[in-house]
Curated annotation (Swiss-Prot):
Designated name of the protein: Pyrimidine-specific ribonucleoside hydrolase RihA
UniProt KW Hydrolase keyword: yes
GO terms assigned for molecular function: purine nucleosidase activity; uridine nucleosidase activity
Positions of the catalytic residues: 240
Pfam families for the chain: IU_nuc_hydro
Bridged cysteine pairs (disulfide): none
InterPro entries documented for this protein: I/U_nuclsd_hydro_CS (IPR015910), Inosine/uridine_hydrolase_dom (IPR001910), IUNH (IPR023186), Pyrim_hydro_RihA (IPR022975), Ribo_hydro-like (IPR036452)
Record keywords, A-Z: Glycosidase, Hydrolase
Gene name, Swiss-Prot/TrEMBL: rihA
Length: 311
């Protein structure tokens, strides 16, 4: 039986590819998709969800827009990475359907209530919507199987020296998620920076030759440009968000550890840092499964295999 999931995202090139991977995978039943502000403004990320589902001919999936800003802070966006639209590069279709007439939290709550079994929430943007759901609907916590997030890092950040972008945007929300008591799976930079797509991988996807694989290749063409900056030391572009979906599909591709994670919300230099108690120094019980390594070739092969679904 397919695993029911609820996808909360802020597309974003890698979010878009996570949507492509999820909807190409019969093991997953995508119940709804909600958008969060992050990689671009809330209006643009919502539009990008609708554009991607129009491309994939999945306008049957309910969509709702989420919070317009973080819980306690002004919004920061990553337009320097994802461009003016949030999905610069390919020519994507205009949406042919409208979002639901409700908020992201309302759609999430409805989805959880109506599901016969607990739902896995996959969150690939800032954690604002998920935190609002957890705070406003404590009675639904038991309907959440786990929360799989792309965010954080055990080591170095990518937005500040200490913080990864998604967590930095709304650290208070991320702290609510980690301390919720619900199982959390964290795909942080420690693993996503190893899940790099090289130029030859992009050409492999392009050669599959269907409209979706072509769009994915064009998304990667654009995404690679930002990551060519020599400061990163990358061979390709780290495909952060699809690691969440890939872990659900093939957990054997990933090495994980069970650790306690907290989020720094006050630090002068470390605001938004995910503090991972790697050596069990705090005495706190682990609250997260933290991904630390990935079989890069296996990850690329999975993407290539699933892109053939769209032939």
């Amino acid at each position: 039986m397919a695993l029911p999931i609820l996808l909360d995202c802020d597309p974003g090139h890698d979010d878009a590819i996570a949507i492509v991977l999820a909807l190409a995978s019969p093991e997953l039943d995508v119940k709804a998709i909600t958008s969060s502000a992050g990689n671009q403004t809330p209006e643009k990320t919502l539009r990008n969800v609708l554009r991607m589902l129009t491309l994939l001919n999945r306008t049957d999936i309910p969509v709702a827009g989420g919070a317009v800003k973080p819980l306690m802070r002004d919004l920061i966006i990553a337009d320097n990475v994802h461009g003016e639209s949030g999905l610069d590069g390919p020519a994507l279709p205009e949406p042919t359907f409208a979002p639901q007439n409700c908020t992201a939290v309302e759609l999430m709550a409805k989805t959880l209530r109506e599901s016969a079994e607990p739902v896995t929430i996959v969150s690939t943007g800032p954690q604002t919507n998920v935190a609002l759901l957890l705070n406003s609907h404590p009675e639904l916590h038991s309907k959440i199987a786990r929360i799989v997030i792309m965010g954080g890092a055990m080591g170095i950040g990518n937005w500040t020296p200490a913080a990864e972008f998604n967590i930095y945007v709304d650290p208070e929300a991320a702290e609510i998620v980690f301390q919720s008591g619900i199982p959390v799976v964290m795909a942080g930079l420690d693993v996503t920076h190893k899940a790099q797509i090289h130029v030859e991988d992009t050409e492999r996807f392009r050669a599959i030759g269907n409209p979706v694989s072509t769009i994915v290749a064009e998304l990667l063409d654009f995404f690679l440009e930002y990551h060519k900056d020599e400061k990163w030391g990358f061979v390709g572009a780290p495909l952060h968000d699809p690691c969440t979906i890939a872990w659900l599909l093939k957990p054997e591709l990933f090495t994980t550890v069970e650790r306690w994670v907290g989020v720094e919300t006050q630090g002068k230099y470390t605001q938004g840092m995910t503090v991972v108690d790697y050596y069990y120094l705090t005495g706190n019980k682990p609250n997260a499964t933290v991904m630390v390594d990935v079989d890069r070739q296996g990850f690329v092969d999975l993407l290539a295999e699933r892109l053939k679904f769209y032939a």
